[in-house]
């Protein structure tokens, strides 16, 4: 079959979207596939990876063994990809690339959510620190070892640059004041990811979809856990307006269904706001190619100014009432202790790691050993980290 006969135009694309036929390719050259575009192959490689499966037992706020219904990194990533594809379709972007970036964006996260990352970053501080985006890049370019001709997944340039820069440029005048992790700089020396430019719109869709999903679904989990009540949301401008609509339409609706309806309508409201604002941004900038997106002096897929305020107020509310809840903080502290003690144990006694990792640790010292341990630790699920802690230290459930 002639590769030229593949229908790469199965969906309408804007002139400023990514296109598989003009992809900048992969670090290691591969023949084109006769059935799938390069971005479809990226998505499929991500889904079939070990790192993707491990997301099933990694959490964000609630620990994985607390309930079967709280969200994990896996369910969150799927929900982000669904929202991101909705945005991409409405903006005439490449949906497969958008989905790939959305599905891979959490690969580098540690067990126990942000508490685990804070603990690992503190343990790694004298060895270069730990950053989940840099770790995700390590995973897809080095640590996943499934192919005969290369380490990593050998993803396209567009997926990698979207992974690394979905929150904005890392270098140059529009970068946030944050040191670029060495792993990103080292890879960038091999394959230039244009770290001083904005990411493509597909990555921007994945980034804002992450925000939309995170806020809405933490409300859902907060209500499910009973750490939050619907009454509290009557004092948050965005949710108060939605709740009023719901109660006006369904005055007898029970609390559970009201909560689910709140979450659904909040997602819809935010998506509609992003699309309206993004269309306005595009109309003003008038990009004629994807390079105009890379060289833009701003993020294009954004909330409106008013929604930005509402979203910040909602985040503040969640921090004060959920993330800083006494029981959540207690579990965060326990999680940090587990990660810190595991790191120290492995660093002082590398032979306590599983055999395959012990072999890698032979002759490694200082920063190289610490980075190996960070690779091992960050790849753990919540369940595996707890098992390791119990094996090495005690049999107490520290989250009871």
UniProtKB/Swiss-Prot annotation:
Under the heading InterPro entries, the entry gives: dGTPase, dGTPase-like, dNTPase_2, HD/PDEase_dom, HD_domain, PHydrolase_assoc_dom
Q: Where is the HD domain?
A: 73-215
Q: What keywords would UniProt list here? A: Hydrolase
The terms under GO molecular function for this entry are: dGTPase activity
User: Superkingdom of this entry's organism?
Assistant: Bacteria
Single Gene Ontology BP annotation: dGTP catabolic process
UniProt similarity note: Belongs to the dGTPase family. Type 2 subfamily.
In its UniProt entry, what is this protein called?
A: Deoxyguanosinetriphosphate triphosphohydrolase-like protein
Q: Which organism is it from?
A: Bartonella tribocorum (strain CIP 105476 / IBS 506)
């Amino acid at each position: 079959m002639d590769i030229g006969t593949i229908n790469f135009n199965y969906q309408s694309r804007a002139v400023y979207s990514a296109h598989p036929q003009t992809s900048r390719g992969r670090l290691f050259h591969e023949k084109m596939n006769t059935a799938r575009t390069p971005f479809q192959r990226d998505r499929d490689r991500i889904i079939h990876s070990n790192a993707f499966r491990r997301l099933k037992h990694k959490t964000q706020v609630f620990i994985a063994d607390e309930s079967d219904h709280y969200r994990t990194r896996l369910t969150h990533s799927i929900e982000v990809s669904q929202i991101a594809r909705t945005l991409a379709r409405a903006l005439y972007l490449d949906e497969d690339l958008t989905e790939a970036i959305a599905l891979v964006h959490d690969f580098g996260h540690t067990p126990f959510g942000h508490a685990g990352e804070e603990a690992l970053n503190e343990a790694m501080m004298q060895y270069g620190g730990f950053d989940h985006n840099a770790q995700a890049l390590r995973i897809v370019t080095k640590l996943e070892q499934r192919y005969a001709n290369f380490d990593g997944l050998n993803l396209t340039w567009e997926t990698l640059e979207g992974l690394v820069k979905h929150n904005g440029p890392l270098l140059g005048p529009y970068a946030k004041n944050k040191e670029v992790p060495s792993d990103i700089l080292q890879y960038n020396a091999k394959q230039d990811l244009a770290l001083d430019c904005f990411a493509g719109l597909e990555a921007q869709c994945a980034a804002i979809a992450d925000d939309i999903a995170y806020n809405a679904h933490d409300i859902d989990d907060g209500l499910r856990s009973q750490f939050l009540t619907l009454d509290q949301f009557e004092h948050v401008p965005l949710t108060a307006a939605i709740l009023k609509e719901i109660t006006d339409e369904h005055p007898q609706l029970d609390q559970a269904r009201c909560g689910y309806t709140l979450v659904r309508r909040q997602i819809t409201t935010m998506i509609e706001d992003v699309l309206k604002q993004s269309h306005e941004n595009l109309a003003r900038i008038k990009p004629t190619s994807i390079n105009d997106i890379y060289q833009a002096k701003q993020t294009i897929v954004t909330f409106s100014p008013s929604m930005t305020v509402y979203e910040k107020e909602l985040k503040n509310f969640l921090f004060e009432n959920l993330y800083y809840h006494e029981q959540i903080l207690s579990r965060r502290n326990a999680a940090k202790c587990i990660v810190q003690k595991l790191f120290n144990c492995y660093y002082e006694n590398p032979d306590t790691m599983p055999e395959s990792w012990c072999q890698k640790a032979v002759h490694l010292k200082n920063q190289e050993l610490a980075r190996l341990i960070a690779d091992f630790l960050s790849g753990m699920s919540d369940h595996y980290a707890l098992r390791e802690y119990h094996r090495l230290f005690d049999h107490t459930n520290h989250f009871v």
